[in-house]
């Protein structure tokens, strides 16, 4: 500590960004972990080092001042910084013991109430980071769910050791924990957009609220948290989890919509739709993840082998071709990490808005619709629009979930895209699916397409580096509507048992024919989002990803990408017999006819204004 008192931080002769991050012992103030041990030891040996007390405490104060001066205020860094400052404050004497008046009370007040350029007060951070209506933190799910635990742990430390009750002062800390189940797919793993490794819900936030409630003998809050913790457990019954999850949930501060038919791991569907707003986000346009039969079959690609510091992250994993989205002219992109590119909600059913971000909980929704047999009561949908900044292209995506039976259902995906000022070259519709086998067929004859090796979809021509990561490419011109099957074979008997006896899961996609369209079958780099996933069907991180691309030459607004996706398995075959398309009378609308094996036909119309009729 004597050395810290006399030490100065390194000086960057280039006056670069690193100068604003550097700590006394590390190159980033959030990694000053030595503070944890030193602040625990100092009170124990304080009486033994009385002669050095002044210089030791001067060192601690210098350390705190450097953390206040350097760092990042607008994300989880601020919280890590505040944690170190509070730990230092708690070993200092009262303010009057120091000539500058900066002691225990000064630093505690600074963390809670004061603001500087690189150290916001916890109050300001909470106001900035949480959406007041949806209660979501403004980072990708992996980071957001972790922050709930960190904030809770920090708040408990302040409450226990300094008598500052942040939970009472900021009720959103508890509300956000209560809402955290909205991140879950039916398999009880979190959505995977941005820099996320999906897994079961991090219950750190719940545990910290429980700790607080127990200390304050708040029986109601203890009961609420115990019920929530039980409900988000992987094997919790539907009656529990469906009281915490909505049919439609919209988080405007991360530009994300979750749409569910229910939370049955095996039989329900969920679509996760996101743009790029907030921290730890990717350049993904309007991206989509699709769930079925126990897995997110159509996932994001993940972070990258070396997380977000590697070249593969910079060139591929954070870019649009790694996501289920549409790339314009081969160049669509924008800054990643702290991103400002949100979508706008055009239409939805049930309706969600910034002011009313959640529809009824699934338990209520099912009670209100179980007696209705009309098709419209089996459909939920969301339409969002997005301005792709690199090419100034207007994009609109309609995603719908349609239940066909207690065990089955399908998705509709209608993606429109055009450059505002014209001059469209290409629009590339990307879809990635788990699995080891991919079959692309003519939807009418059922015969495989005659696909030839190609070097299209390349960086050559001034396109994104990400195109260079796509390989084993084959293509064919679209003559008729097509049918594509992505087959996932489960190889481990223990996983077969965990997945209700399924050995083979198939995602079937039907895509509407359009002129000037080329279909590609290819492979992409391994999915590194699910490398930590339990019950993997195969070693996901060791195998390339099955990749489907439809390239529309010219604009894709009046020639939209229209697809139907149905998940099925060897133990639960699909309900769809065939899919046809028709031209509705409404200008710009898309018509879809889904014929089921039970003889019924479902007729749906996706209008240009974003609404869906049946």
Regions found by a protein language model. Give the residues of each.
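Aromatic-lined, polymer-binding surfaces characteristic
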Residues: 1-174
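Surface-exposed intrinsically disordered loops and tails
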Residues: 6-16, 104-132, 136-138, 339, ...
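Carbohydrate-active enzyme catalytic cores, enriched for enzymes
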Residues: 142-297, 585-586, 593-600, 605-614
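Acidic, glycine-rich loop-and-strand cores that form catalytic or ligand-binding grooves
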Residues: 216-247, 492-531
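Catalytic and substrate-binding regions of extracellular carbohydrate-active enzymes
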Residues: 222-450, 555-557, 567-569, 584
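Short, hydrophobic/aromatic-enriched beta-strand segments in well-ordered soluble domains
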Residues: 429-431, 506-509, 518-536, 559-570
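Non-catalytic terminal regions with compositionally biased, polar/charged low complexity
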Residues: 535-614
């Amino acid at each position: 500590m004597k050395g810290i008192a006399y030490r100065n931080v390194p000086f960057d002769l280039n006056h670069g960004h690193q100068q604003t991050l550097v700590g006394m012992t590390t190159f980033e103030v959030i990694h000053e972990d030595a503070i944890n041990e030193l602040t625990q030891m100092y009170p124990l040996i304080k009486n033994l080092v009385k002669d050095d007390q002044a210089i030791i405490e001067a060192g601690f104060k210098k350390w705190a001042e450097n953390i206040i001066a350097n760092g990042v205020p607008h994300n989880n860094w601020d919280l890590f910084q505040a944690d170190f400052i509070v730990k230092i404050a708690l070993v200092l004497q009262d303010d009057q013991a120091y000539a500058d008046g900066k002691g225990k009370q000064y630093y505690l007040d600074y963390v809670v109430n004061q603001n500087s350029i690189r150290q916001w007060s916890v109050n300001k951070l909470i106001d900035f980071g949480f959406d007041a209506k949806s209660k979501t933190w403004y980072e990708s799910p992996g980071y957001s769910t972790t922050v709930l635990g960190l904030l809770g742990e920090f708040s408990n430390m302040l409450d226990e050791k300094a008598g500052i009750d942040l939970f009472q002062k900021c009720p959103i800390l508890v509300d956000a924990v209560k809402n955290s189940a909205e991140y879950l797919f039916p398999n009880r793993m979190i959505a995977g957009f941005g820099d996320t490794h999906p897994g079961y819900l991090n219950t750190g936030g719940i545990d910290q609220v429980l700790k607080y409630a127990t200390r304050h003998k708040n029986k109601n809050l203890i009961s609420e948290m115990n019920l929530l913790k039980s409900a988000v457990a992987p094997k919790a019954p539907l009656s529990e989890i469906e009281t915490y999850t909505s049919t439609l949930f919209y988080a405007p501060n991360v530009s994300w919509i979750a749409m569910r038919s229910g939370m049955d791991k095996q039989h329900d569907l969920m679509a996760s739709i996101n743009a790029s707003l907030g921290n730890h986000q990717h350049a993904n346009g309007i991206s989509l993840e699709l769930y079925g039969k126990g897995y997110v079959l159509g996932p994001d690609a993940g972070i990258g082998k070396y997380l977000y510091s590697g070249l593969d992250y910079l060139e591929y994993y954070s870019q649009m071709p790694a996501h289920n989205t549409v790339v314009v002219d081969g160049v669509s992109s924008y800054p990643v990490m702290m991103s400002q590119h949100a979508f706008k909600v055009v239409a939805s059913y049930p309706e969600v808005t910034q002011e009313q971000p959640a529809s009824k909980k699934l338990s209520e929704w099912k009670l209100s619709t179980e007696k209705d047999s009309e098709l419209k009561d089996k459909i939920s949908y969301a339409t969002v629009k997005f301005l792709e900044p690199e090419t100034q292209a207007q994009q609109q995506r309609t995603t719908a979930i349609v239940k066909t039976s207690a065990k089955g259902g399908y998705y509709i995906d209608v993606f429109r895209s055009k450059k505002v000022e014209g001059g469209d070259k290409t629009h590339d519709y990307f879809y990635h699916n788990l699995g080891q086998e991919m079959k692309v067929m003519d939807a009418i004859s059922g015969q495989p397409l005659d696909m030839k090796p190609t070097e299209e979809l390349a960086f050559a021509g001034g396109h994104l580096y990400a195109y260079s990561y796509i390989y084993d490419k084959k293509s064919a011109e679209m003559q008729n509507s097509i049918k594509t099957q992505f087959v996932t074979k489960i190889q481990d008997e223990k996983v077969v048992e965990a997945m209700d006896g399924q050995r083979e899961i198939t995602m079937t996609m039907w895509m509407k024919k359009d002129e000037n369209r080329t279909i590609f079958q290819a492979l992409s780099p391994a999915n590194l989002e699910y490398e930590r996933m339990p019950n993997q069907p195969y070693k996901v991180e060791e195998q390339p990803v099955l990749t489907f691309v439809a390239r529309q030459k010219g604009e894709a607004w009046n020639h939209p990408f229209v697809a139907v996706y149905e998940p099925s398995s060897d133990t639960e075959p699909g309900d769809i017999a065939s899919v046809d398309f028709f031209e509705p009378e409404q200008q710009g609308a898309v018509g879809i006819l889904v014929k089921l094996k039970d003889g019924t036909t479902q007729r749906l119309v996706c209008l240009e204004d974003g609404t869906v009729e049946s």
